[in-house]
Amino acid sequence: MDERPWQKNYDNGVPFSIEYPPVPLFYFLEKAAEEHPDTPCTIFKGAKITYREMDAITDQLAAGLAEIGVKKGDRVGIYMPNTPQFIIAFFGILKAGGVAVATNPLYSAREIEHQVNDSGLEVMLVMSNFYKMIKEVQPKTKIRTVVVTNIKEGLPPILSFLFGLTKEKKGGFKVELSQGDIWMKDLIEKHKPGDRPKLDIGPDDVALFQYSGGTTGVSKGVIAVHRNLVANTLQIRYWMTNCNDGNEVTLMAIPLFHVYGLVAGMCFSVRAASSMVMIPNPRDIADVLESIQKYKASIYPGVPTMYNAINNHPDVKAKKYDLSTIKGCISGSAPLMLETKEKFEGLTGGKLVEGFGMSETPTATHCNPLFGKNPPGSIGLPLSDVDARIISLDDEVTVLGPGEIGELVVKGPQVMVGYHNMPTETANTLRDGWLYTGDIARMDEEGFFYIVDRKKELIKPGGYQVWPREVEEVLVTHPKVLEAGVAGVPDPYRGETVKAWLVLKSGETATEEEIKEFCADKLAKFKIPTHVEFRNELPKTTVGKILRRELVRQHKEAEAQKPA
């Protein structure tokens, strides 16, 4: 069999291998500023910052960070939603020689405390409405300086003025800084671009601590060096064969604190000198739709939940928006259903393809071709310079052939250096240059890969094996079902049994029996859910992954409260 059967299915123009320049990640920003100086880098509610301006501002911030004691290798936190300030903070940190640590704005004080202490960061750049939370956490950490920005600083003058009048205080954005803390605006304005520290920052210097989403337990700090991020940025750029540098508009709704938004959204856009339309709240579908139409967005990285929301929006059905400028979208983080893909492509005329990656490969390893085959259920082909194998679950070494199910292992220039402070986890995950993903998968004869499920989420009812994803994929084909989550729950007879949690489409009703009957000729008897629970929504990560373990926790809690 061909060693890399996937290469023959690459789109025309996608190289088998790429030459990666030995440069720091911010080289792409400097190059965009040089080649496309007047192209907007960010657009936020109408306010634009060009690539020339972004390069200069981030130089100034780097000088400011150096002034407050940030040295090469220091970890620096970012705690903000998708705004121009996030991008300024990220590249300012890298230019100062720092290591960016992006934090989820939805995290609790306990979760933030864990990240801050684990990473050892001492300086944090935050949006003002999160300042109070950081000050609560600060005494339990080594944070010494908080650099604060207000969302209105990224807005056009008139909107900034109106925001100050109507929403600033109510939204918690108006804050008084404690001694030792500083406004980001002041830190930038104190310096000229030429003040940036003169540092030797190379491809093997650490650029990012990316904390994994924690869908399978405690959040782990992935260490990525500049060459990892440079490589994946270029792999994605070369995959997007219909993209023209300096002429694209990226809708940045996918959160930047997540590695998918950070690399496939922001880094890709900077390399392509694409204008990023910043969407701080991805659930604000009206903002998403208006932004696509107003700014003629052409690239829209997202998750299935986002594309579904557009597909089912009443104003889209009523044809109130022109979405025809969309030409390329990569969907990640959750399975992309064929119905979602076909409907979205029909509405926009663009391409929507499923990709795959992890925090440990910041960010992508596989993607379906934009113009070639897209087999239903496939995560696609390994990207340029990525090797992938399916290995035996028994000995974790034997390479399996097409159609056989085992663990997906990958190797490529984007694979992380390791986990921070977790040598055992690192040794278990990285073996002889191969990353053991923990995902159960198969590869077909043509080199397309398919995820079967997470290794840790296998359900074993009475000794059988049930992969939750297989059951979920059947359930979402029911005409009344919008979303499905499946997991194993304790069962006194079988030890464990299959439970499904369903969200129905608007206005629909269904019964447990109806769902079980629907599954009867599509699944083996032991795979059919024993329990079906209908919900208004399912717990998810910020990028739309269903949290199966949270569903199980809620189930156990409810069972414990039942009378004996």
Language-model segments: residues:
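Conserved AMP-binding/adenylate-forming
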Residues: 248, 274, 279, 328-329, ...
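Conserved AMP-binding/adenylation subdomain of ANL enzymes
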Residues: 230-249, 259-298, 313
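Conserved adenylate-forming
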Residues: 65-70, 191-204, 209-252, 274, ...
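Adenylate-forming
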Residues: 81, 126-136, 149-157, 254, ...
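Conserved AMP-binding/adenylate-forming core of the ANL superfamily
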Residues: 21, 38-83, 87-91, 108-113
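AMP-binding/adenylate-forming catalytic core of the ANL superfamily
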Residues: 126, 300, 412, 417-418, ...
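ANL superfamily adenylate-forming
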Residues: 7, 133-203, 314
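AMP-dependent adenylate-forming
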Residues: 4-7, 27-50
